[in-house]
UniProtKB/Swiss-Prot annotation:
Homooligomer or heterooligomer (probably pentamer) with neuronal pentraxin receptor (NPTXR). Induction: Rapidly induced in neurons of the hippocampus and cortex by physiological synaptic activity. Residues 224-425 form the Pentraxin (PTX) domain. It comes from Rattus norvegicus. It comes from the Eukaryota. Binds 2 calcium ions per subunit. The gene is Nptx2. Ca(2+) 1 binds at N278, E356, Q357, D358. One of its GO terms (cellular component) is glutamatergic synapse. This is Neuronal pentraxin-2. It is found in: Secreted.
Length: 432
């Protein structure tokens, strides 16, 4: 205190001397300094003291100036929050229009930006909910900061009440928006569930109708006088042979087929066993030639049946040296060996018509599907003689397979595939 008084006296004396002896052309410049600079080395003149403290008027004036700046800052913050709420309200109105199904066309395209809400109503609601929750958190943080500042600086009660009331109004508006969004989200969920249930009911009705049609076509003139129709290249239309194969050391497979696809007829049949999906497969994929796969080993067959006409094909194979033969319309077009030699065909697998299996009984690929009609699919456990194959192909004899015969009650169809009465053998010959 003594030092301050001494400094004040010295300052007063210097000022008096300056007045008595002014320096020509000189002037005094007053510059405002921050409190830190004053404390560091520029002491200010002592303010009038009364009992060692500021007067009530000066204390109130300082508090009012401080909180006037605080109120200006809070107004700016509240203005920014008001703009954010206005923007979110606008987006909510757009969301409500979208929920009614009339705001947008199904063919529109766009990106999910702040000006272009996502197409999925659920995503819209979730995005707005997150935005409102963020705004609420910011308001709560602002309110907490306000309480802290008020407790530290002694904010006048009228200012505190005004700000508290304004924050309360904003919070209530925010809670109302959140409640509206929750109701909207629940409504959209209910509408989506109802639409999904309606779709499932429609699909079930169609499936039941297809099943009725399939059953209605089961009365054929004879058990083998039918064909399996696979009209589309999909991964769900197929036929399934109920019986499975025993262990085989030789076989002959014959069938009639008429392909509706080009290039590549797809997969007329496939046989898969656990551990080997390509135990026996006949496939023509893309522009590749027809291939016979046995135990995933490949032989290319010189067969050409993708002209949309009925064709009779037979394939023989024996484990001895892997010998194979390929017949088309009764004529032997190719032969070879070393196709999975000394490998017996494994028993207990699944035999599928029209699809290539990647796992036993499933994982079909639409690009490898057969499109067209199949009939008279028979399997024998031996290599048929060439004359026997000719007689079957020219309708001279009816010779069912002794392992897999072509009969109605041994073939199931799925996914929209169907069974229909087949043309007579003579009619198929005329189509060649």
């Amino acid at each position: 205190m003594l030092a301050l008084l001494t400094a004040g006296v010295a300052l007063a004396v210097a000022a008096g001397q300056a007045q008595d002896n002014p320096i020509p052309g000189s002037r005094f410049v007053c510059t405002a300094l921050p409190p830190e600079a004053a404390r560091a080395g520029c002491p200010l003149p002592a303010m009038p003291m009364q009992g060692g403290a500021l007067s009530p008027e000066e204390e109130l004036r300082a508090a009012v100036l401080h909180w006037r700046e605080t109120v200006v800052q809070q107004k700016e913050t509240l203005g920014a929050q008001r703009e954010a709420i206005r923007e979110l309200t606008s987006k909510l109105a757009r969301c409500e229009g979208l929920a009614g199904g009339k705001a947008r066309g199904t063919g529109a395209t766009g990106k999910d930006t702040m000006g272009d809400l996502p197409r999925d109503p659920g995503h819209v609601v979730e995005q707005l909910s997150r935005s409102l929750q963020t705004l609420k958190d910011r308001l709560e943080s602002l309110e907490l900061q306000l309480h802290t500042n008020a407790s530290n600086a002694g904010l006048p009660s009228d200012f505190r009440e005004v700000l508290q009331r304004r924050l309360g109004e904003l919070e209530r508006q925010l809670l109302r928006k959140v409640a509206e969004l929750e109701d909207e989200k629940s409504l959209l969920h209910n509408e989506t569930s109802a639409h999904r249930q309606k779709t499932e009911n429609t699909l079930n009705a169609l499936l039941q109708r297809v099943t009725e049609l399939e059953r209605g076509n089961s009365a054929f003139k004879s058990p083998d006088a039918f064909k399996v129709s696979l009209p589309l290249r999909t991964n769900y239309l197929y036929g399934k042979i109920k019986k499975t194969l025993p262990e085989l050391y030789a076989f002959t497979i014959c069938l009639w087929l008429r392909s509706s696809a080009s290039p590549g007829i797809g997969t007329p049949f496939s046989y898969a066993v656990p551990g080997q999906a390509n135990e026996i497969v006949l496939i023509e994929w893309g522009n590749n030639p027809i291939e016979l796969l046995i135990n995933d080993k490949v032989a290319q067959l010189p067969l050409f049946v993708s002209d949309g006409k009925w064709h009779h094909i037979c394939i023989t194979w024996t484990t001895r040296d892997g010998m194979w033969e390929a017949f088309q319309d009764g004529e032997k077009l190719g032969t070879g060996e070393n196709l999975a030699p000394w490998h017996p065909i494994k028993p207990g697998g699944v035999l599928i018509l029209g699809q290539e299996q990647d796992t036993v009984g499933g994982r079909f690929d639409a690009t490898q599907a057969f499109v067209g009609e199949l009939s008279q699919f028979n399997i024998w456990d031996r290599v048929l003689r060439a004359q026997e194959i000719i007689n079957i192909a020219n309708c001279s004899t009816n010779m069912p397979g002794n392992i897999i015969p072509w009969v109605d009650n041994n073939v199931d169809v799925f996914g929209g595939a169907s069974k229909w009465p087949v043309e007579t053998c003579e009619e198929r010959l005329l189509d060649l």
